């Protein structure tokens, strides 16, 4: 029993720490890029995508914090409406995060494409096309996740093994094998498509970086080889985030299938939640640390606070 209590406490501290740190980091990233976006005469699409991604991740972590409260604290039970609304919103925001990360990769691939490339003709209209694609994918996610509005219920008082644990107040109704297979296949195809798109765009950017490095070595230019351009730094940042995202996605699926295999209702579920929200927590730190103007803003703010 003591071992279970210790694991429960560790999971609770880890989850709330992840949520609080992620909310703080995404808030800083969101407001910093929003100020840049509003302060520019010609707003850069890159700032718009970072604002969208950080806002989505911020709301996702806030929603996750509310769900975590119901998982670990007995502050009164929810009825079906809060359960359905929060779980549905949480599922949507997770899908939106994947879409935003994928489309950021695609946008940067189009931005870096040379004039001779077939992608160059999309440069001027890429923000409009990508925004339209994002809205289309959002509507698609909303329709595919709509079954949660009827599958999620308030956990009944009676003890039963037919309900799948979600939180203390919420449970998932069992579905037929055909419905489960349909939803699982649809989700797998959708996410495989988006991750494949991310992988292709990342491969394209790696090729461009390699060519740029070869050209710099050929020209024997120390200025090109010793100091990376803002485009190269941004490309490395996005590639790093892409690699991190894929690793976490694979790890999350391993934990999910372990949960299904061992029929564990809480332990593997908590680990899965922590892993699945790690990207939303860590990615803003990657952007903050790799963008020079962000570090300058934070240093100036810290200096002003210290001087006060």
Swiss-Prot record:
Extracellular side: 1-18, 70-91, 154-188, 258-267
Listed transmembrane segments: 19-39, 49-69, 92-112, 133-153, 189-209, 237-257, 268-288
InterPro entries: GPCR_Rhodpsn_7TM, Vmron_rcpt_1
PROSITE patterns, alphabetized: G_PROTEIN_RECEP_F1_2
Molecular-function annotations in GO: pheromone receptor activity
Keywords per UniProt: Cell membrane, Disulfide bond, G-protein coupled receptor, Glycoprotein, Membrane, Pheromone response, Receptor, Transducer, Transmembrane, Transmembrane helix
CDD domains: 7tm_V1R_pheromone
Residues in the Cytoplasmic compartment per record: 40-48, 113-132, 210-236, 289-308
Top-rank taxon, per record: Eukaryota
Entry similarity comment: Belongs to the G-protein coupled receptor 1 family.
Function: Putative pheromone receptor implicated in the regulation of social as well as reproductive behavior.
Cross-referenced PANTHER family: VOMERONASAL TYPE-1 RECEPTOR
Protein name (Swiss-Prot/TrEMBL): Vomeronasal type-1 receptor 92
Native organism: Rattus norvegicus
Gene that this sequence comes from: Vom1r92
